[in-house]
């Protein structure tokens, strides 16, 4: 039987925790010393870093069974954070800090432990995410470094399919075995939960850079476990089936050079996130945007004369992040009027993606703008969602979408035009021919993706302020 968790903010018997605090502190120092020893023996930097990563994670896993309060964990993790900060500035512990790439993982790791401990209502929902972060992430890095042949790039960092595969299988076991042995969850549910969680967390790992996987992996694992625990086997099977459909769609999108691999992974996470957060009246209108977007892809494939650069993960997220934020607010507040700014943000983001696809086909721009701005409000209206309180608010959402596109269209005159030093091709992309591009004209801040994000945000705020007055 799992131990129940009392109020984590009450520290009634601190003297009982002192031996544990001292033991863990000594353990951390020994792990850092071992990492330095491994580095000085000539072992690769990645191995010495992951030695500390695995050791610190294994020390943190039993915290819910050792401590009744969060305060000892705050003391331990804050001390570790300060040690990492001071050692970084003084060039100590190069077994941890000596990695060549930019990484904030050593500083994020202790903060994440505190936050996951505070969020998790079940000890296993804390222990499993920390175990995945400690073991699966280390396995992915080491296998990818040694055997990674099929490489791809995400925001300047290199990943490999071998490393991601090495992340998936340990994650499946780390989720499946504890649920099977220490909970009342049925066998079928355990397999489905572990499979779905492994897919989603592996996707997060593929697009995380600069040590931010130390945030996305544990929070993603915790969130999926916390939500999947309430689902019946049929619901879990339905969601995994939807993942499979998305997988087929984005494989085709990669095949036709619409997305890069990481851009497709980002799109997969965004759409699945919309399903998870906004099934209640939000998801079907958002899903309807795929029809006109697919039409834009087909038009470009049939009649486009210039091959467009595939969309990366930054373009994907900057076109959809505002809609996802609206959904997160709805998930916490259940305010039905948020449907309208969501329609504005999702429609505008999809239009910007479509305009990028048909940028040299001016004949089709206006039909795409009108089609994509209209289809989502109409589907919301005729799907008879209970969130529709006033049809006039749909008109506000439609005006908000056109406002976003107008801001975007006007602002593109200020965007940075870049040139590739190697082939002298003008482009809007930060990288071309495998190297960094140089600014030819415009302001470096106003990239195409940032202009799109600013336009969507402004129009969504406009729609929210207008509709909220009548909510």
Regions found by a protein language model. Name each.
Residues 1-42, 47-93, 106-154, 160, ...:
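Hydrophobic alpha-helical transmembrane segments
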Residues 93-102:
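Short acidic (Asp/Glu) patches
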